[in-house]
Amino acid sequence: MDRSAEFRKWKAQCLSKADLSRKGSVDEDVVELVQFLNMRDQFFTTSSCAGRILLLDGGINGFEVQKQNCCWLLVTHKLCVKDDVIVALKKANGDATLKFEPFVLHVQCRQLQDAQILHSVAIDAGFRNSGITVGKRGKTMLAVRSTHGLEVPLSHKGKLMVTEEYIDFLLNVANQKMEENKKRIERFYNCLQHALERETMTNLHPKIKEKNNSSYTHKKKNPEKACAQCITKENDKELENDDDDDLGINVTIFPEDY
């Protein structure tokens, strides 16, 4: 079976499976983006989360939060208010932790070139911890992600360790991150549409394709210039201030049984 046929088989199998996430469906803020990618021949999404604010109640034998072994006291993909957190905290018996988790998207790509286009767009949109993973069987995965998360312990053994004023402060920070996260998703979607339109035009005109052969490398070195029509000066400034994010491409090889 050739690579294209094998990719189509993987795509059909993945998209026919039931959604096994807790919610059981794609988050509202990324439905259009996910549908757009899945309609393209060269991509399909394997998992996604639009970003969320969580209050988790973990065990009392350590501070490391394991989402699989803890109680979800509160989860929202929208802005969160203090009263909801205070009410949820009353149910905590162990170590409650407030978290903000930014947008994450995993996309299987038909070939490395397709993944490079998505990676370049993700970097330009502010998801600077994105990376590409290549398996020995030919599976090429693109992970869109960033590092602007938040994780703060609030209680220990069921006892609240912070003031309500501090909780209010943390929620302001988390909500700001949620709003910035949404802007980045919108930038990513807009830039993606422009990039794929350019790719289509390039494929229709071979001379343009030859001229743009080094575009991915150029974008990687100069992400602030690569999608000028998608990113305003104000947005560009926000990305410059995001010092925790790292630029670059991450390519690893999975074992044979991947």
UniProtKB/Swiss-Prot annotation:
Record-linked Gene3D superfamilies: tRNA wybutosine-synthesizing-like
UniProt modified residues of type Phosphoserine: 25
Pfam families reported for this sequence: TYW3 (PF02676)
Pathway assignment: tRNA modification; wybutosine-tRNA(Phe) biosynthesis
GO molecular function: methyltransferase activity
An individual GO BP term: methylation
EC identifiers of the protein: 2.1.1.282
Signal peptide: none
Keywords for this protein: Methyltransferase, Phosphoprotein, S-adenosyl-L-methionine, Transferase, tRNA processing
UniProt keyword annotation of Aminoacyl-tRNA synthetase present: no
Reactions that this protein is recorded to catalyse: 4-demethyl-7-[(3S)-3-amino-3-carboxypropyl]wyosine(37) in tRNA(Phe) + S-adenosyl-L-methionine = 7-[(3S)-3-amino-3-carboxypropyl]wyosine(37) in tRNA(Phe) + S-adenosyl-L-homocysteine + H(+)
InterPro entries according to UniProt: tRNA_yW-synthesising, tRNA_yW-synthesising-like_sf
Role according to the record: Probable S-adenosyl-L-methionine-dependent methyltransferase that acts as a component of the wybutosine biosynthesis pathway. Wybutosine is a hyper modified guanosine with a tricyclic base found at the 3'-position adjacent to the anticodon of eukaryotic phenylalanine tRNA.
Membership in a protein family: Belongs to the TYW3 family.
Name of this chain's protein: tRNA wybutosine-synthesizing protein 3 homolog
Gene that specifies this protein: TYW3
